[in-house]
């Protein structure tokens, strides 16, 4: 029996899960197994929809541009893309023509039919596709090809190879898709390879969902951290320094400093010990850690130094990660089970050679500072440490205003190459799954998404406009304890290998800065705002009164000042609204007499005749409690 028979009468089912494998409905169900349905509007269903849409995109391009050669075309978080080698770059007009052709293919109801073939057969069928041949030559003996079959004639209209699964036919795609933009990329991300055109699109289960997504995209343009960073004078990325290397200006520096100081305090409260490591090291360390083997393409080239002490000199590298250094700290002295868990933290700056096309503002940079930590634990304390790390993550992100999450669990692909025994992987995966489920958060599986050295869980956080960002990772490592010969002495006096956990709660301060800038649309909560209080005198006669009041804030380390400019008051207010100052105070004659001020908020609401002590207490409470204050109602809630 296949999936079509098993789910007959279920028009909403587009694929199935059996033995933790995603399968086409056309595949046979193993004897004694009961498959789970995958509906179109489920997370897996949307992934399959988008993957099928990528195939239709490629078919449309090749039907219009006969010279187009195929690269790869996966689904993405909200859509899909496909890479093409073409003689001329695609334009916006090209995308409209391609999209029209896609709709024609969708309405023709072509079936997606899977067939497993050997490498020789695949080589023959894709003999005119050089990029596909490169992939075929690097694959195992067999691979699956999906054929688009004409509904009337039964002839093959197009084909591509991939794991699948796919929708039963193109008709299931519907009309809720759109091509969004095109960019230039290098084949396999390597600048030594040919340049290709990457066409992006999005696809959804309904027209309403598509419109909602496109509306969010337009909103995202308004809150783009690159745009706001320039408007608010937060940071820049000067060409003189190089791609992906950021300068934080005074205001941006204040925000980042507040972010770092609070995160450091919370880490200390959670029992982490801060260490520091250099930015460069000899080649030997990264050979020992395996980074040169597994991560070398993402590292900056070496610097040959120390020829005065050695005729050949030594290769030094900018560090891409902090973990090898922390393992040296662990191994610097004998360790007992009494010292574990050992939590080593570092706000360490690392350098990664991202391709120029992948760099994106502060969200993807070449120089980044990670809120990095490595936990060395016994097997007995491993589960508790992972649970604590996850709880700490959720709590800390909540303090910065992110409070909606789901957890992704990345496990290994059974066919891949991995370090560690099957028993170790099964144990670690079980613990991560248990901790994730015990958290009460929604969980999603990411089969095959684990790194070669261990499974991981990642926290995906939802921002104010509905986008999810991968924020925090908690990653098990079977690799470094083995490579660095790490051990501790247990109760019986025997040497045991510690379990090592990598975790970064923000990913990097640069990326988290970008996320918060867009989440708050530049209107940071008062505790993070570079300028927290600005006081405006109606006339110069009111300056001494405001100076006296504003001076009180300095004892609380609150950033407050009096504006001495001679501009008209309405103009000043408009200027500070544009700068997104959380608290704008105004004082005139009546305020001097009554010892009050007027306080204006970002949305234009205000409170007049507010006693200065009450104003002071409210501002201090807003900052101390890390509350977002946009309106009078927000401020009133703090005063209650």
UniProtKB/Swiss-Prot annotation:
Highest taxon of source: Bacteria
Keywords assigned: Aminoacyl-tRNA synthetase, ATP-binding, Cytoplasm, Ligase, Metal-binding, Nucleotide-binding, Protein biosynthesis, RNA-binding, tRNA-binding, Zinc
Record-listed E.C. numbers: 6.1.1.3
Membrane-spanning residues: none
Quaternary assembly: Homodimer.
PANTHER family: THREONINE--TRNA LIGASE, CHLOROPLASTIC_MITOCHONDRIAL 2, THREONINE-TRNA LIGASE
NCBIfam families: thrS (TIGR00418)
Family stated for the protein in its record: Belongs to the class-II aminoacyl-tRNA synthetase family.
Designated name of the protein: Threonine--tRNA ligase
Organism phylogeny: Bacteria, Bacillati, Actinomycetota, Actinomycetes, Micrococcales
